[in-house]
Amino acid sequence: MVNDIIADSLTRIRNAAMRRLDYTTLYYAKIVVSILEVFLAKGFIESYKVIDKDGKQSINVVLKYDEKGRSVISEIKRISKSGRRVYKGRDELKRFKNGYGTIVVSTSKGVIGNEEAYKANVGGEALCSIW
């Protein structure tokens, strides 16, 4: 069993992108699906699909590459960890990497990107960053 399913999912995506794989498979969790929704909306992944096989669910993530075959994901990091939670206020979420990156934030309005959190005037737990 994985202790930190978010960190495991981010590592699987990072490793698959470095190896230039077409897709990768992640363990299923609602929080992971919410994070993938943000990645999809921001254009960091092509698509994802929840697979139910023998009563166990998993997620297939199709990675996205540019026309030269390079991954659109330069770096992906876990910010808030189980031993050290990191919270960001509204003003700390305005821009990240000059708008090229996104901080995924768990707020009272759900799991959203940093720009949406800034516009909604909410802060929350910074789950991960991607650029």
Swiss-Prot record:
One of its GO terms (molecular function) is rRNA binding. GO terms for cellular component: ribonucleoprotein complex; ribosome. The keyword Ribosomal protein applies. Part of the 30S ribosomal subunit. Contacts proteins S5 and S12. Keywords: Ribonucleoprotein, Ribosomal protein, RNA-binding, rRNA-binding. GO terms for biological process: translation. Pfam families: Ribosomal_S8. One of the primary rRNA binding proteins, it binds directly to 16S rRNA central domain where it helps coordinate assembly of the platform of the 30S subunit. This is Small ribosomal subunit protein uS8. It comes from the Bacteria. Disulfide bonds: none annotated. InterPro entries: Ribosomal_uS8 (IPR000630), Ribosomal_uS8_CS (IPR047863), Ribosomal_uS8_sf (IPR035987). Belongs to the universal ribosomal protein uS8 family.
